[in-house]
Design a protein with these regions (language model features):
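Extracytosolic (periplasmic/ER-lumenal) interhelical loops and adjacent juxtamembrane/interface segments
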Residues: 37-59
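Hydrophobic alpha-helical transmembrane segments
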Residues: 61-84, 96-99
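Hydrophobic helices that insert into or interface with lipid environments
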Residues: 91-182
Length: 519
């Protein structure tokens, strides 16, 4: 009996759902988070033109990865569902094509063995094709059962893998921040960003889950004594603490992709001495467990930059999202350039031989240094204030040499020097404040930071190629006839949409203008 179009559509949707769920189930059984559809997400990120990715980040901010996941899921379900209306043979062909794409994406993942990649891809493909003959109701039942089992298996494995890590005492503990380092102003960014509110961004899809007992840190390349350290062996080495800002290169001026934390780990230079790095080596390539790589020019050491391999954040072991068990940290360098997560190996080499992920995507080969930067946290953009004395406050940073002063300007007038809280260190951000006698009307507030080696750039620029530039600027209303508001929603939404669109346009223009190197 022939199917009606709606019945055929449901049959195709059910078979596609079985295929997706079977891929997740097989991945859970094999002990990996990389299922076929997630591998496709990573392949998509690696394949799309970098300017297009930059536009997506500018427009979607934290929603870029969820948008990719939703789009891939809808595509994986929708194409077979539509193909089913053309007949069973067309449906089988669509599922086979989807399965082969997933297999190809899995095959590219360096953290998966060939056996695992083939198993996941073939299981998902076979399950989808078999789902054609189950019927819609049975397919959905099997799919939900497989997805539920995958969730249970992953949670059980996660609990078993949750091994306690006892952090060593650093050589010179920093101690608690002094009270003078924190300004008690509502709405001001915290001096130390809590781990659960620290921004998370990377090109991994999904974040790797590392088994601590099996993890090794390998130091190789141009060294006399190659090293292979367990986590316990790394923890036994002399460590230090540092308060430092970490910022994504895609962070717009005044944006959320920046945080300040207390990190603990070992100095890269100590590991290089231990391994006997060759004197002619001038570059270090860092490899992640998922195949991502980034480099550190050893010339940075002469300029006051101090790369570290860190395993603790705010006094606790790194979380999976933040790179557990070990990540690199180079205060003063943007995140993508050297601060890689889930570190697996350190390769000592010559710069002339180094082409890493970012360079292959068109980013410059030179180190991406953070510029002096300042952000206004209080008041919010679009706030409605009363006509009396207001406090303007925010945070400023200029790692690794520190902030010299912060200035505030109202309506394009003269700059006034802001009061700084006590700095935790040259690589950390510092809180600042300034009084303002607000008068009725709409006003524009701007801030800039003077670092030890220069001042924040005024000319607005896109994140590519050296990080976003320009003064952080907000506008507020001052009225005596209305109740003060933290944010005027409609105005704020319109301004936010305009800012995202402008950032995306600047990004496209920057890529056209610079004609980036491609490795």
């Amino acid at each position: 009996m022939p199917f009606s179009p709606s019945d055929a559509w449901l049959q195709g949707l059910g078979a596609a759902f079985v295929q997706l769920a079977a891929g997740e189930f097989a991945a859970a059984v094999r002990g990996t988070h990389t299922s076929p559809v997630r591998a496709l997400g990573k392949w998509l990120v690696d394949t799309l033109p970098t300017p297009l990715i930059d536009v997506a980040i500018a427009l979607l901010r934290r929603g870029d990865k969820p948008a990719i996941a939703i789009a891939l899921t809808l595509f994986s379900l929708g194409v077979p569902a539509m193909a089913a209306t053309a007949g069973t043979a067309t449906l089988v062909a669509a599922l086979l094509l989807s399965g082969l794409l997933g297999l190809y994406a899995l095959w590219r993942r360096t953290e998966l063995s060939r056996t695992t990649a083939a198993t996941l891809g073939l299981v998902a493909t076979a399950a989808g094709i078999l789902g054609v003959f189950f019927g819609a109701e049975a397919s959905f039942a099997i799919g939900f059962a497989a997805a539920g089992l995958a969730l249970v298996i992953r949670r059980v494995r996660q609990r078993r893998r949750a091994e306690p890590v006892r952090l060593p005492r650093p050589q010179a503990p920093l101690g608690s921040p002094p009270g003078s380092a924190s300004l008690e102003i509502p709405g001001l960014s915290e001096l130390i960003t809590p781990v659960d509110r620290f921004f998370v961004t990377d090109v991994t899809f999904p974040a790797p889950s590392v088994v601590l007992r099996q993890w090794r840190l390998v130091v190789r390349g141009m060294v006399e004594h190659p090293l292979s350290l367990t986590l316990d062996e790394l923890l036994s080495l002399p460590s230090r603490e540092i308060d430092a800002v970490l910022m994504c290169v895609h962070n717009p001026v005044g944006g959320p992709f920046v945080g300040n934390a207390r990190w603990q780990g070992v100095l890269l230079r100590d590991l290089l001495v231990r391994a006997g790095a060759a004197t002619e080596a001038d570059h270090v390539r860092l490899h992640s467990v998922d195949g991502f790589s980034a480099g550190i020019s050893l010339s940075l050491l002469k300029d006051g930059f101090e790369p570290m391999l860190v395993y603790a954040m705010n006094g606790t072991p790194l979380t999976r999202a933040h790179g557990a068990p070990v990540r690199a940290l180079v205060p003063g360098i943007h995140g993508y350039d050297a601060n890689i997560k889930w570190l697996a190996s350190v390769e000592v080499m010559r710069f002339s031989e180094a082409i890493d992920y970012a360079e292959r995507k068109g980013w410059p080969r030179r180190p991406s240094r953070m510029a002096p930067n300042s952000r206004i946290d209080v008041p919010n953009h679009s706030a409605l204030l009363a006509p009396d004395r207001q406090i303007v406050a925010g945070v400023a940073w200029s790692p690794p040499h520190g902030v010299a002063k912060v200035e505030l300007r109202i309506d394009g007038g003269p700059w006034q020097v802001c009061a700084l809280a006590t700095a935790l260190g040259p690589s950390a951000w510092v809180q600042w404040q300034a009084p303002w006698d607000a008068t009725p009307g709409r006003h524009t507030l701007e801030t800039r930071t003077w670092g030890r080696e220069g001042v924040q750039a005024e000319l607005a620029a896109a994140p590519y190629p050296d990080g976003a530039r320009g003064y952080h600027r907000i506008a507020v209303d001052v009225q005596s006839t209305r109740t003060p508001q933290r944010r005027q929603v409609c105005w704020w939404l319109a301004s936010d949409a305009r800012a995202r669109g402008l950032l995306a346009w600047r990004g496209i223009t920057a890529w056209r203008r610079h004609r980036p190197h491609r490795g």
